[in-house]
C-alpha cells in the first residue's frame, strides 16, 4: 500500500504502553512507509473519545486503546464494531482475567499508573545520578553506583546509562583510553557491579566515522583508524581482565537488548 498505515493510540493516561507495543509489532513488517502513529492521550470523556474515533474512521485507521475506564473502553469498542474499524483493546482482556483470578475489581483509575510515589522519585534520582557521573566526571560516584559501565569510546555507555536510569538503576560509566589511567575507585567496588562493553573493530570504525562526519571532521582521523581501534580494544580487554568483570558485545544489539542483558547479569548476583 502506498499510504502509511495510520494507527490511533487512545488512552486515558499517557499512552506510551500502546506506543511501545505498536512499534514492536510494526518493526516486524517490511512497510513501504513507517506507520503513522497518532497518540491521543488523557482522553477522559466520551466527547473527546468520539472526536478521536471519528478521525480514525475518516482516515481508515486502526485503533489501539489503553482506556482504563471500562465505560470508555466499551464505548470505543462499540463504535469500532459499528464502523468496521480494526480495534485492539490492550488492557481489558487482561484486566478481566486478573479480576476473575483474584476476585477483586479493577480500580479503573487511569492516573494510578503514574502516581508520584517513591518509585517515581527513585527514578528521578537515578536519572540525575547518571547525568552527574556520566563519562567518569567524578570517580567518587563509582562507589555508589548500582552498575558501572566500562568501555572504549562509542560503545553505547551513555545511552545505556540513561536507559537503565529510567529503570531506577544508578549507573556510572568510565571511558577507557590507553593514555589515561583508570580510576582507582574501579578496584574498590565488587566486580559483579561492573560491566565491560566492547564491539568488533569493523563496527567501531563504522560508528566512529559516522560520528566524525556528524561533527564535520575528517573520517581519516586516527580516532577511526584500524591501528588506533585495535589498540583501544586490546586495552579494553586487558582492563576487563584486571577488573574481573563480565563483558558484553554491543555490536548489532539495540540499547534495549543490551540493557536487558546487563540487568540479567546484575540481578543474577542478588
Curated annotation (Swiss-Prot):
Reactions that this protein is recorded to catalyse: N(tele)-phospho-L-histidyl/L-threonyl-[pyruvate, phosphate dikinase] + ADP = N(tele)-phospho-L-histidyl/O-phospho-L-threonyl-[pyruvate, phosphate dikinase] + AMP + H(+); N(tele)-phospho-L-histidyl/O-phospho-L-threonyl-[pyruvate, phosphate dikinase] + phosphate + H(+) = N(tele)-phospho-L-histidyl/L-threonyl-[pyruvate, phosphate dikinase] + diphosphate
Coiled-coil positions: none
Protein purpose: Bifunctional serine/threonine kinase and phosphorylase involved in the regulation of the pyruvate, phosphate dikinase (PPDK) by catalyzing its phosphorylation/dephosphorylation.
Protein name: Putative pyruvate, phosphate dikinase regulatory protein 2
Key words of the record: Kinase, Nucleotide-binding, Serine/threonine-protein kinase, Transferase
Homology family: Belongs to the pyruvate, phosphate/water dikinase regulatory protein family. PDRP subfamily.
Entries under NCBIfam families matching the protein: PRK05339.1
Record organism: Listeria monocytogenes serovar 1/2a (strain ATCC BAA-679 / EGD-e)
Positions with a binding annotation for ADP: 151-158
Pfam families in alphabetical order: Kinase-PPPase
MF (Gene Ontology): ADP binding; ATP binding; phosphotransferase activity, phosphate group as acceptor; protein serine/threonine kinase activity
EC number: 2.7.11.32, 2.7.4.27
Amino acid at each position: 500500500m502506498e499510504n502509511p498505515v495510520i494507527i490511533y493510540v487512545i488512552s486515558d493516561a499517557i499512552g506510551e504502553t500502546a506506543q511501545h507495543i505498536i512499534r514492536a509489532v510494526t518493526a516486524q513488517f517490511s512497510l513501504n512507509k513507517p506507520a503513522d502513529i497518532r497518540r491521543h492521550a488523557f482522553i477522559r470523556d466520551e466527547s473527546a473519545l468520539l472526536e478521536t474515533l471519528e478521525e480514525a474512521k475518516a482516515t481508515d485507521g486502526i485503533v489501539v486503546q489503553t482506556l482504563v475506564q471500562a465505560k470508555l473502553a466499551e464505548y470505543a469498542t462499540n463504535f469500532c464494531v459499528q464502523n468496521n474499524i480494526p480495534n485492539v483493546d490492550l488492557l481489558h482482556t487482561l484486566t478481566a482475567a486478573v479480576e476473575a483470578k483474584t476476585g477483586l475489581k479493577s480500580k479503573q483509575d487511569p492516573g494510578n499508573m503514574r502516581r508520584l510515589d517513591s518509585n517515581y522519585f527513585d527514578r528521578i534520582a537515578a536519572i540525575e545520578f547518571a547525568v552527574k557521573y556520566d563519562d567518569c566526571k567524578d570517580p567518587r560516584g563509582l562507589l555508589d553506583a548500582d552498575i558501572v559501565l566500562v568501555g572504549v569510546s562509542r560503545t553505547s555507555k551513555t545511552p545505556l546509562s540513561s536507559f537503565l536510569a529510567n529503570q531506577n538503576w544508578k549507573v556510572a560509566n568510565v571511558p577507557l583510553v590507553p593514555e589515561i589511567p583508570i580510576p582507582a575507585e574501579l578496584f574498590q567496588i565488587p566486580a559483579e557491579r561492573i560491566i565491560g562493553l566492547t564491539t568488533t573493530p569493523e563496527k567501531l570504525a563504522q560508528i566512529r566515522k559516522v560520528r566524525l562526519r556528524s561533527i564535520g571532521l575528517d573520517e581519516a582521523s586516527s580516532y577511526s583508524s584500524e591501528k588506533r581501534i585495535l589498540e583501544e580494544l586490546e586495552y579494553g580487554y586487558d582492563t576487563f581482565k584486571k577488573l574481573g568483570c563480565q563483558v558484553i558485545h554491543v555490536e548489532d544489539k539495540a540499547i534495549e537488548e543490551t540493557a536487558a542483558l546487563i540487568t540479567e547479569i546484575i540481578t543474577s548476583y542478588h
